[in-house]
């Protein structure tokens, strides 16, 4: 069984609510990959971007820091606020939210992008790694959402977007990496619960997941995966832009796939997103 994929898709492209100039987007894990791609997309529209992530010094295998991302955001036309934030620590979260309000005065959208992953079986997943995945994926998503909510509810078109998959209960998605699947589905359950909880408050809570694997520095470290058969992270950024442009009062509780969103917006050719257009894209996790 797969939790409902989507509803309320606009068939006329992005909605009239797509003016993000001076709007504030709070993004966790925005130093690289999908998070940074989303940040740059909104920066091009003149948005204020909060980079809430841990990396302040370059990692030899995973390049990019919050300060590097901030420079790129400013160059793209946005305003950046890099804040070192471990989303497992509620004090750091609260401090990041307060810094955001002090600088920009509002939070209009939250993108819960930060995630920890270990594709390992039960006997190969020590509790330290288990706790990391649950601390970041479930607790972190919940805690950041909770901290941002009082300010989101003051926005005229507030959105929470979790980079999370549909809940697919096919046992094959649990068989090889039970801990990660449960932790990732925790982010999805936040969408189900919060969208229902705040459905009368005009707050949209949705999930976005890539239909195919996305080319990131982390993906290139996975043995046996052909990164050329992946898509650029810009496809997720374009889909996120479309979703956050929709009326928050009528678009909530959805589990969107990036390709589905863009098809609804009129996109028919996805070859420009491919790392190698001659390759067949590899489906992402949790999709049958």
What are these regions (language model features)?
Residues 24, 31-32:
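Conserved glycine-rich cofactor-binding loop
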Residues 153, 159-200, 212-213:
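Catalytic loop of short-chain dehydrogenase/reductase
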